Every structure is written in structure tokens, then in C-alpha cells.
């Protein structure tokens, strides 16, 4: 099922967190007492995925709950912004994440790897036709090398985000 922040099941078409249960679903993680909140008393498991179910009953997973940026009360899915960036000419890889913002809580930031020089202002302008203004990255960092990866081959979002936050903090001082 798909639930809202209060744990209430949502009607078809509405996005929320995906819960699953069944005989093949685990009931706890081995040696991970910190994960107790992922398992509900009635057998439901919180997947951490943002999803919706359409009117025909098909399930669509659209993002990860941990990869949501909350900017001034607006929820922004990193994958949506990454997809928009990937459509820009010369961008090979994109990684989107939140960075701390005193006023809004978080601000949208991105690190990109491209095969040619990218004009950040032109990139931000072009994103206006694909994304709402509040979803457009305020901070864009250009990497001269392919983006860092973890052992599974996925982009190492945590380390890229940490580096960018450190750079931004350095610029503030």
C-alpha cells in the first residue's frame, strides 16, 4: 500500500511511501536494532520508496524517501531533477542533493560531469521548461572527472554532497 506521512492509505494516483507485507517479507534486519522503525507492528515494512498506484492497480516507484529535498516545505525528488539535467546537451552524469539553507531548510544543488564546457546560467534557464522554478538547482558544481561511485557502481551521492557542502561553507567564511 501507499501511505501519507500519518500512515493513512492513499487513493490511487496519490504519491506516498510504499509499504509492503507478506510471507516473503523480512520482519527485522539482522544485527540492526536501529532499523526497528522500518517494521510496523501489523507486519508492514516501510520500503523507503515514494510510489503511487494508478487506477488500474499498477504500482509506480518514483523516488527514494531519503532522496527527497525539502525546500521551504516543498518536496523535490532528486531523480526528477537528475533526469532533467541528463537531457541537457553535453551532460554525461548528474547528481542532485540538498544542501543546508538557513531560510528554506535545504536548497537544491547538483554536481555534473560533462564532455564540454557548461554555462551554468544557460543550464538553469533551460531547466525552466522542464521543472518548476523551486526545483532548479541553485548551486551547480562541475566535475572535471566522472562522478565518484560506490562499490555497487552507483554514484556516491553522500560523498559528493559532503564535498559540495564543505565548498559552500568555505565560500561563506
Where are these regions (language model features)?
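Hydrophobic alpha-helical segments, especially N-terminal targeting/anchoring helices
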Residues: 3-4, 12, 47, 53, ...
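Conserved beta-loop-beta connector loops within the AMP-binding
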Residues: 1-19, 55, 117-120, 156
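AMP-binding/adenylate-forming catalytic domain of the ANL superfamily
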Residues: 132-154
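Phosphopantetheine-dependent thiolation modules in NRPS/PKS and related acyl-activating systems
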Residues: 154-173
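A short acidic/small-residue loop/turn micro-motif
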Residues: 17, 67, 162-165
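Conserved ATP/PPi-binding loop(s) of AMP-dependent carboxylate-activating enzymes
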Residues: 6-38, 76
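AMP-binding/adenylate-forming catalytic core of the ANL superfamily
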Residues: 22, 27-28, 50-135, 146
